[in-house]
Amino acid sequence: MVQNLIVPYIGNRKVQELRTYDIEKFYATLAKTPCGQYVHGVKQTLTNKQKKRLLSSTSIHEVHTLLKTAFSYAVEWDLIHKIPLPREAPKANSEERTIWDEKTMLAALQTIENPALHLAVHMSMILSLREGEILGLQPSDLDFDAADGRGTISVSKTMQRANKDALEKLDPNQVYHTFPDRREGSKSSLILKKPKTKKSNRVLYMTKPMKEELLAWLEKLKQDEQNAPEKYSNCGQLFRLPDGLPIAPELLTKWYRQWRSAHPEFEQIVFHGLRHSSATYQLLQSEGDFKSVQGNTGHATAAVLMDTYAHTQDKPRLN
């Protein structure tokens, strides 16, 4: 977020020079900015269709939260005398924060027949994993004997699709692997890279149902390879197609949207909303232990988590 939504616009300004007017003007610019305008700090060439999809108010609200944290440190270090942010933060769109309660999550999960989608949704709901983190997992990240047999999952990589012009300018130390293109002339590549932030590196505990599903999935992968060894190309990822190639983020999104369209009985949320639902449920169960939940979700700071999910603390008082 810093690299793509802050640095390109105000990154060349000295912190002492920034005034409230500058920040308000910056927010106004972001409100007119297409999603994906910058990737890894590199400006992208967008299609007319892509240009119409603007940044959400929630993204701008998250930028405000990051700036608030940064400026607070600047005040503490005597670099500035006061925080130059507007009194009122940009309001996040409540529709973008639609979440499911635990009963809805369980009911929805029981309707998913696609085994790969079922596992991905299960992991997002239970472990608060991002889509790229799920697809970035490898079998070696699973330890079924750890934690006295409970089992753990190590999160240290993320998968994403990147335009090749952006990939050329990306620090090679950030990229673990670039997958071969499935089509000639492709303008983008599927990559395995370091996660969003250092806090995103974390070890999570399996639940019993999660452990059972993971073991069954690994058995399926083994069976797929045995069924057609001459056509199988093991990409090394946990989430693979029957031919061994990686499941790309756009394919997982397609499957999720198809399932969502087939089940209008559930309140419509995007895939990332499953992570929000999970984090909200964890906060309610832990009675607002933001620091503990941050360790599970991988948010950069507890402050970011708190700002995003503080509304969940009203639920127990309203019941």
Predicted feature locations:
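N-terminal DNA-binding recognition helix of tyrosine site-specific recombinases/integrases
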Residues: 4-5, 13-21, 25, 35-87, ...
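Short, basic (Lys/Arg/His-rich) helix/loop patches that form interaction surfaces
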Residues: 35-39, 110, 114-115, 127, ...
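Short pre-functional
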Residues: 65-72, 118-135, 152-153, 280-281
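Flexible interdomain linker/hinge and immediately adjacent N-terminus
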Residues: 25-26, 76-109, 242-243
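Major-groove DNA-contacting interfaces characterized by cationic-aromatic clusters
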Residues: 16, 44-48, 181-252
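Conserved tyrosine-mediated DNA breakage-rejoining catalytic core shared by Y-recombinases
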Residues: 104, 137-219
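Long, amphipathic, Lys/Arg-enriched alpha-helical "connector/arm" segment
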Residues: 21, 38-48, 91-117, 126-129, ...
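Catalytic-site neighborhood detector that most strongly recognizes the C-terminal catalytic loop/helix
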Residues: 91-92, 99, 150, 159, ...
